[in-house]
Amino acid sequence: MTDEPVQSSQPSQTLQISYSPCPNDTFVFDALAHGRVPGAPALDVTFADIDITNGMAERGESDVLKVSYAVLPYVLDAYALLPCGGALGRGCGPLVLTREAGADLTGRTVAVPSEKSTAYLLFRLWAADTIPGGVGEIVVMPFHEIMPAVRDGKVDAGLVIHEARFTYQNYGLHKLADMGEHWENTTGLPIPLGAIIAKRSLGTEALTLLADSIRTSVHAAWDEPEVSRPYVMAHAQEMDPAVADQHIGLYVNEFTAGLGEDGYAAVRGLLTRAAAEGLVPPLGPDALDFP
């Protein structure tokens, strides 16, 4: 599913960009995708869920992508982490849901949306700290199938993200643990969820312009949130507008405008801990530098 390329006021190559149809992404990119950021590069937008964009990044298939921070160790040779546009925050972490309150997950089956996701890394770090015997089988399934699978007893627990925070009780499920809460309590840092990356081959000038343009787009959305509403709701997959607003409020924040010292510390902290657990390759010392 693609949008037509938008012409910018400044001649430049059209950048292929892929991000999710989730409200936080469409809110952030609305002004930029619709040519309302003066001097910004033209974009050719493709919508894809983050598990798809993670794979696209590993194959080098797009100029700019919204990906999970968990995939960075695999792609930073070819892509640079942009200092804005992504999703970090507090109180917005993934949840582990069960049918019964207080269930013991030792040796139990857990459904996850992806094994290359920040949610999964946070889950494994939580499990390493809190389940000495370890969980059992990990089953990867599409995000929208996880809560029904837990409800129907097909799996013992499910790892969920995004708007499931607001809807899991509709399935009669219980929150066993909040991965973000565990992360924040043990590190004091925000939760790194989604990153914007762009090909290093675009060059310093283009990367800097892109980052500036994304930052401008974020501020435009904050200044006039009603302008982005049609774009957000057109791609929100029949989401209730109030849930879309909660989603935006949770995931679009100061770290979206700029990672800052805490944001970079959170990203490096997560990936360093994950590497120590053998979950991802180690990061080089300059891997997160921009541009």
Feature locations, PLM:
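Conserved C-terminal helix/tail region of periplasmic/extracytoplasmic solute-binding proteins
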Residues: 273-291
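Bilobed "Venus flytrap"/periplasmic-binding protein-like clamshell domains
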Residues: 12-34, 93-157, 161-163, 265-268
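Hydrophobic/proline-rich hinge and linker segments of small-molecule sensing/allosteric domains
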Residues: 81-102, 185-201
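Beta->alpha turn/N-cap motifs
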Residues: 49-51, 57-73, 142-143, 160-165
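Pocket-lining segment of extracytoplasmic ligand-binding domains
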Residues: 142-233
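A local structural motif
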Residues: 36-47, 127-141, 280-285
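Secondary-structure end/capping motifs
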Residues: 203-273
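Hydrophobic residues within well-ordered alpha-helices
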Residues: 56-58, 150-151, 210, 274
